[in-house]
Amino acid sequence: MLGFVTGVLAISAHVIVSQPNEHSPVVVARETYGLRDVIFRRLRSYETDTASARAEEGTSDIEERSDHEIPPDFYKRLASTSTPYVANLSHKAQIAAQALRKDAERSKGALELLKKYAELEGKMDAPKEEKNHVDRLKAAAFKEWNEKGLNLDQVRVLFADNKRRTSKYENLIEKIVGEYEKS
């Protein structure tokens, strides 16, 4: 029975780790992977604690014991020590997902502004409506950044979608940051 429970826990821990989740940062994934290690460490420590009893019986593994030979409090102790750890991981994952959503919303305006600037940069005779649209986006973004009290370095970070894309628009980013500094 314990072999079955151990197998189920190992498989579920592997599934948790192997399933991609875009809202879960690497730190939470590492801690989730650590859950499997915690469970196996606790199983090994239980085996170590009862090593002398097994040596007398001639058994080497807890999996070799039948259900009635395993102390009834073993599952209870394992669950009581593992459940808070799992609950804590779930809470951390929720907090991390909320932070990622906030960051995505915050940088969304910056990336949209950069995209519109790039579109206007290529056009010599851009229609007045497009220029007005960019000005409205810029005013809204600058207002939001001023309310949050962002400094110039923090504004540059908002545009850091990925390295390749950022280096392509470096001049435009500096232009936007310069305009933000003047405002």
Swiss-Prot record:
The keyword ATP-binding does not apply. This is Secreted RxLR effector protein 41. It is found in: Secreted; Host nucleus; Host cytoplasm. Its main location: secreted. GO terms for cellular component: extracellular region; host cell cytoplasm; host cell nucleus. A motif (RxLR-dEER) lies at residues 41-65. It comes from the Eukaryota. It comes from Plasmopara viticola (Downy mildew of grapevine). Residues 1-18 form the signal peptide. The RxLR-dEER motif acts to carry the protein into the host cell cytoplasm through binding to cell surface phosphatidylinositol-3-phosphate. Belongs to the RxLR effector family. The gene is RXLR41. The lineage of its organism: Eukaryota, Sar, Stramenopiles, Oomycota, Peronosporales. Secreted effector that dos not suppress the host cell death induced by cell death-inducing proteins. Keywords: Glycoprotein, Host cytoplasm, Host nucleus, Secreted, Signal, Virulence. Glycans are attached at residue 88.
